[in-house]
């Protein structure tokens, strides 16, 4: 079996908002990498056995901060790439000089490559479009570094050490705005570090299945299946690895999208022949939420009840030794870096679930090394439907945060129908994958309407569609008026409890993507 971790890159995080992008670009090239805080122990760095090290950007100023790269980084004799702050601290630690720029540079810039011989710019054109985001700049490279690229506002746009495989760039090759950023990353990782491209979906599947078999043996495993991307992919890979030793518990809250519960059972229980226990808990959730209007309270009630029901069912499974979870690499990084990270967290996630306290279960997390895009590709490799893997994000509390105020059975059914029409038409008009997220929101207010010759006094549905790269900011989707008119007409005509449809044109900020 191929050892997918044999050649790897270590990324030291100085707090840049782009650090995870660096890791994703390295992996896209086909090389495994991991992110650790910049102040991780020197012995850890020494024993990690990386083929190369990347120093991320960060929000600090080198000349008024004591945040430096660990000296061990430059003593291991392996290649180093410093990005933005990473370049500045590397140059400064080798006798160079960094000062505050007269003018901060944020946005696209043209750099001129001065030297592309056997370095990160090999086989690249003389002029390159890149993405700058910095307030400081290198003013003196010192005796050890030479300038290999420059721009109008950044005379030192890239450097190379004169005798060691150390390179630095003032711009961000990891962003898509840098036209040939992936080529720069590939030149460093493959050509300079000498990494073999072993990190691909086929090898990951083979490696994961072997690891799961070795770890689990003949033990039984329990998985909470939600129908979301992560738990679905965990179910698929565990089933391939251990077959009937896996039992999935699907808690149907009644707050899912229209027919979603049946679709989950169809894919996993019928098509893939996985042992799935479906718990119809709709009434328990409605009872628990009766009279509750506060969004945060609704979230907590839904989350706690979900865990309680899962615990009840899990306790019935005899001799289970493992609890599988859909933890992915982004969760691991956020959990590990909460204290060190300088990047500002804009919003917490709607995660529900937890480890049953009274059960002595060991944790199994087959996806903990993978980013979301890798999880989706893994799912395709395991035979899961494309539309299941590439659906828009859905909050943990489900429609509970898309019904404003109190949740009632009538409200849930009304929203499910309206939301399904919106989604169906997005697919029909090839617009679904042009937007990042689209859904309906139930407003518990009534509005007068006329359908046929009849006066109608019913509820309002708001349609929400946004375009976003990272979901930390978003713009409202400029969907065609004819399309919105069609969706509105269908909802008002087909969903009797709705008399009016409105479209949300609020960006994020100032609004959030979800209404609650």
From Swiss-Prot:
Classification via Gene3D superfamilies: 3.30.300.10, 3.40.50.880, HUPs
Gene source species: Francisella tularensis subsp. novicida (strain U112)
Superkingdom: Bacteria
Catalytic activity: XMP + L-glutamine + ATP + H2O = GMP + L-glutamate + AMP + diphosphate + 2 H(+)
Residues involved in ATP binding: 226-232
Encoding gene per record: guaA
Annotated ranges, domain Glutamine amidotransferase type-1: 8-198
Entry protein name: GMP synthase [glutamine-hydrolyzing]
Catalytic residues in the record: 84 (nucleophile), 172, 174
Top enzyme category: ligase
MF terms (GO), sorted A to Z: ATP binding; GMP synthase activity
Assembly mode: Homodimer.
């Amino acid at each position: 079996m191929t050892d997918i971790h044999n050649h790897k890159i270590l990324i030291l995080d100085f707090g840049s908002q782009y650090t995870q992008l660096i890791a994703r670009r390295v992996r896209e090239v086909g090389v495994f990498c991991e992110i650790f805080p910049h102040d991780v122990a020197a012995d850890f760095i020494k024993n990690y056995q990386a083929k190369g090290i990347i120093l991320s950007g960060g929000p600090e100023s080198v000349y008024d901060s004591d945040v430096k790269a660990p000296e061990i980084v430059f003593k291991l004799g392996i290649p180093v790439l410093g990005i933005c702050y990473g370049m500045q601290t590397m140059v400064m630690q080798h006798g160079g000089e960094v000062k505050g720029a007269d003018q901060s540079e944020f946005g696209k810039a043209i750099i001129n490559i001065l030297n592309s011989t056997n370095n990160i710019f090999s086989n690249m054109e003389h002029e390159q479009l890149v993405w700058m985001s910095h307030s400081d700049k290198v003013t003196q490279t010192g005796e050890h570094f030479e300038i290999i690229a420059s721009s109008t506002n950044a005379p030192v746009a890239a450097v190379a050490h004169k005798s060691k495989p150390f390179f630095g760039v003032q711009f961000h090759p990891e962003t898509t705005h840098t036209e040939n950023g992936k080529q720069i990353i590939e030149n460093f990782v493959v050509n300079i570090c000498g990494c073999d491209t072993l990190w691909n979906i086929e090898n990951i599947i083979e490696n994961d299945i072997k690891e799961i078999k070795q770890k689990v043996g003949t033990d039984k495993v329990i998985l909470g299946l939600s129908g979301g991307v992560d738990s679905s992919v965990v179910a698929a890979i565990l089933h391939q690895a251990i077959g009937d030793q896996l039992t999935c518990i699907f808690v149907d809250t009644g707050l899912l999208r229209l027919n979603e519960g049946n679709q989950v059972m169809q894919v996993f229980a019928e098509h893939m022949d996985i042992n799935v226990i479906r718990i119809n808990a709709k009434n328990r959730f409605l009872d628990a939420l009766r009279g509750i209007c506060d969004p945060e309270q609704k979230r907590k009630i839904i989350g706690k009840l979900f865990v309680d029901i899962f615990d009840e069912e899990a306790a019935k499974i005899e001799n289970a030794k493992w609890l599988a979870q859909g933890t992915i690499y982004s969760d691991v990084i956020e959990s590990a870096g909460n204290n060190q990270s300088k990047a500002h967290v804009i919003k917490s996630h709607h995660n529900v679930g937890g480890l049953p306290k009274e059960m002595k279960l060991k944790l199994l997390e087959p996806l903990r090394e993978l980013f979301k895009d890798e999880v989706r590709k893994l799912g395709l490799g395991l035979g899961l439907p494309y539309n299941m893997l590439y659906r828009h994000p859905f909050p943990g509390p489900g429609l509970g945060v898309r019904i404003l105020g109190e949740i009632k059975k009538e409200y849930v059914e009304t929203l499910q129908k309206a939301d399904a029409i919106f989604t169906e038409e997005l697919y029909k008009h090839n617009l679904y994958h042009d937007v990042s997220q689209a859904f309906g929101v139930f407003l518990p207010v009534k509005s007068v309407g006329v359908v046929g010759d009849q006066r109608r006094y019913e509820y309002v549905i708001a349609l929400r569609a946004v375009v976003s790269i990272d979901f930390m900011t978003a713009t409202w989707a400029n969907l065609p008026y004819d399309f919105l008119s069609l969706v509105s007409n269908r909802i008002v005509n087909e969903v009797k409890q709705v008399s009016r449809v409105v479209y949300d044109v609020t960006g994020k900020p100032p609004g959030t993507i979800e209404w609650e």
